[in-house]
Regions:
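Extracytoplasmic metal-acquisition and chelation regions
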Residues: 25-313
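Bacterial N-terminal signal peptides that target proteins for export
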Residues: 1-12
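C-terminal segment of classical bacterial N-terminal signal peptides
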Residues: 15-24
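Short, aromatic- and cysteine-enriched interfacial helices/patches
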Residues: 2, 24-25
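N-terminal non-cleavable signal-anchor helices
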Residues: 12-15, 304
Length: 313
């Protein structure tokens, strides 16, 4: 892959040289977002002042993504790269090195209070490169699943854009404030939806443990056969243990995720007798014509699927 990336970069070097330093931001700010959720935040903050490229596209899995030569070219041309951090993007450092980008890299989880991943899969996830605190505790990188954290991402994006393009700062701040108001309203909707579900029914199953921040923020319990990363499947013993826990906790619904193979969830559904309730969007947005093409639509879809499967509506 490195040879093809370097070849693609060589083709773009003349363009980069021609751009030079003159009128650095007379043209839109060149922004690279690591995956679609961050890309959506960037669009809402940047508007028409940015030229956005998103690395991991709709329904893509950033845990296992392999970057392309085109990704390296985009990185090399970028003014700003927006990333999640907390080891969410396993491909990131390789892509930075291969592209030799000089872009500013904004880590959007700056200011977020990280939570630790559930201990069942901590050892396996640590072996796969997830961030640890020195022991087997693993930091959950899916901070965007809390709307309160999404607001932090948005603020960090606005700050990064203001630093790179001072002339557009008022616009970025106004856009961020307007979008944050929409997130405030969204959070109220999610809280109301969860409150309508009886406490004893607030247990659901998903493919991998991507919803820890949602669980902590809104009081819904998620059980998952896979850990914080999708890089490896759980063992038969892990699945058997989860099936036992599902029966013990009387889980009310089970869901596939848009980024994972549904086979394992279908197996668990068969063994527990719980009907698959639909698809939740975890680490990526849907295609533009899908039900979760924006972050707000993602949250609307997920809460509607969860509430509908549990309450039968």
């Amino acid at each position: 892959m490195l040879k093809s990336i370097r070849a693609a970069l060589a083709v773009s070097v003349i363009t980069l040289t021609a751009l030079g330093a003159s009128s650095a931001f007379a043209q839109p700010l060149k922004v690279v977002a690591s995956f679609t959720i961050i890309g959506d935040f960037a669009k809402n903050v940047g508007g028409d002042r940015i030229d956005l490229t998103t690395i991991v596209g709709p329904d893509g899995d950033a845990h296992v993504y392999e970057p392309s030569p085109a990704d390296a070219v985009a990185m090399a041309k970028a003014d700003i790269v927006l990333v999640n951090g907390l080891h969410f993007e396993g491909f990131l450092q390789r892509l930075v090195d291969a592209s030799a980008t000089k872009a500013s890299i904004a880590v959007l989880t700056k200011g977020v209070t990280p939570i630790n991943f559930k201990p069942e899969f901590a050892e396996a996830d640590a072996a796969e490169g997830a961030e640890t605190d020195g022991g087997k505790t693993v930091t959950d990188p899916h901070a965007f699943q809390s709307i309160a954290n999404a607001k932090i991402y948005v603020k960090n994006i606005a700050d990064a854009f203001c630093t790179a393009d001072a002339a557009g700062c008022d616009s970025y701040k106004a856009n961020a404030a307007a979008y944050t108001q929409k997130l405030d309203a969204l959070e109220g909707e999610v809280q109301a939806a969860i409150q309508s579900i009886p406490q004893e029914k607030r247990v659901v199953i998903t493919s991998h443990d991507a919803f820890g921040y949602f669980e902590k923020a809104y009081g819904l319990t998620f059980l998952a056969p896979e850990g914080v990363s999708t890089e490896s499947e759980p063992s038969a013993a892990d699945v058997a243990k989860l099936v036992s826990q599902i029966k013990q906790d009387k889980a009310a619904a089970i869901f596939v995720e848009n980024i994972t193979n549904p086979r394992l969830i279908e197996q668990i559904a068969s063994e527990t007798g719980i009907k698959v309730g639909g698809t939740l969007y975890s680490d990526a947005l849907s295609q533009p014509d899908g039900p979760a093409s924006t972050y707000i639509d993602l949250m609307h879809n997920n809460i509607a699927q969860i509430k509908g499967a549990i309450l039968g509506s």
